Amino acid sequence: RQRQMCIRDRVYLNDHEVTDAIRSLEVSRNVSQVSAYGGVRTAMVAQQRKMGKNGGIVMDGRDIGTVVFPHAQLKVFLTASVEERARRRFEELKVKGETVSLEDLKKRISERDRLDETRAISPLKKANDAVLIDSTQMSIQEVAETILSLAKKER
């Protein structure tokens, strides 16, 4: 039996801190292909629903608002341009000492979007009732404040 929890932006799996590992280039390169398998999606959706069964949870993912929690009180579809997402990822990886070109990141992000938008199981799409936030020109603080404001209105 596995246990997972998040504490202050860190992710733990069976008492092992795995935050950096799940954000590695290797995981990023393979996540779309793995998540396209029906058995993987079924198991993940069940686990995610179990984690959120009592409400009061903030969860992110490419199908959270359409598949995992289609009746969530607040759904936000957060996006940014491919260029900005690549720039942000580049800076994140640079801090970790990982080297990759900005152009390579743009290609990988575009390809992941294409794969996720066209997969048969749980495709990436905005829920009809989700609030669209384009964060291309926003700081992380501005994004957080915008989402918190929306959440307060939902209460």
Regions found by a protein language model. Name each.
Residues 15, 44, 58, 109, ...:
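Residue-level signature of catalytic and energy-coupling elements of molecular machines
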Residues 37, 47, 51-54, 112-116, ...:
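Conserved, well-folded catalytic cores of nucleic-acid-processing
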